[in-house]
Each structure stands twice: as structure tokens, then as C-alpha cells.
Amino acid sequence: MSVSVCPCGSGNLLDACCGHYHAGTPAPDAQALMRSRYSAYVLGLVDYLVATTLPAQQAGLDRAAMADWSAQSTWLGLEVESAEVLGGQPEHSFVTFTARWHDQDGDHQHRERSAFVQHAGRWYFIDPTVGLKAGRNDPCPCASGHKFKKCCASYVGN
């Protein structure tokens, strides 16, 4: 049992916060998933980062680069600005945040508006660096059963 404070910035203990999600409990919303992913980078949990990325994108992830970035960075904090459920589509959400870290090149911060989709009771991060191969009339890669153009097309940079 961990007695450390969760890296996500909640002030809660890891086991009472993101540790639940790292152990397999589905995150209840996109913001909780995003916070748990930040914590996973801090803790070097690359398998969790891959598992919580949209399944259609997982094969395109660079696991070694993710592990290197995680290990070679000193994580300085996370600030969540907003979490938005998108109009009429509660299974789609954006979370805007700023993550700060230090590496051999100095201090950095990254502000992002990340897209998330919920499918079969689990939230997934839609990685903007990994393309989705889908035509507008093809089934959506998120496995929602909807056409891509009516589902995730507007949330990814295809």
C-alpha cells in the first residue's frame, strides 16, 4: 500500500486517487483519466498510458519514447483549467491542462486541450500524434458503432 501523495495534484494519497485507476478501476470521467495519465508519466507506468489511449491508436505509440520521457523528466506539476462534455455527446470530452516538467534542457510547460472518448464504460485519450485511418463514412475507430464523421472525426486532426 502506497502512502505517497498522488502526483496529479489532488492532494489525496495515491491509493485513494489515481492509484485506483492504475490498478484497473475505470476512470469515472475524462478529467480523472487525464489526471491519472499525468500520474502514470510521473510513475513510469507506460502500460497504463498505452491501455488508456484509444485502442485503434495503441499500435502507433512509441513505447520506448514514452518510457524515456517519463524517466528523464522531473515532473513539477499539473494544473487542470477545464473539463468540457461536448454538446449533446456526453461520451466525448475535452480537458484543458498545463503540465510542467524539468529535463536536461531546462524547465518546460505544455498546455493542451486533449480529446477523450468513452466506450464500453471506459474513457480513452485520443492521441493527436497518432493518426486514425478512417474515411468519413467508415465505422468510427472508437468502436461506438457510429460513422466516423458523426463521432470522433471532429475531435481528431485527420
Swiss-Prot record:
It comes from the Bacteria. InterPro entries: NTF2-like_dom_sf (IPR032710), SEC_C_motif (IPR004027), UPF0225 (IPR023006), YchJ-like_M (IPR048469). Gene3D superfamilies: 3.10.450.50. Pfam families: SEC-C, YchJ_M-like. Disulfide bonds: none annotated. SUPFAM superfamilies: NTF2-like (SSF54427), Sec-C motif (SSF103642). Belongs to the UPF0225 family. HAMAP family: UPF0225. This is UPF0225 protein Pput_1155. It comes from Pseudomonas putida (strain ATCC 700007 / DSM 6899 / JCM 31910 / BCRC 17059 / LMG 24140 / F1). The lineage of its organism: Bacteria, Pseudomonadati, Pseudomonadota, Gammaproteobacteria, Pseudomonadales.
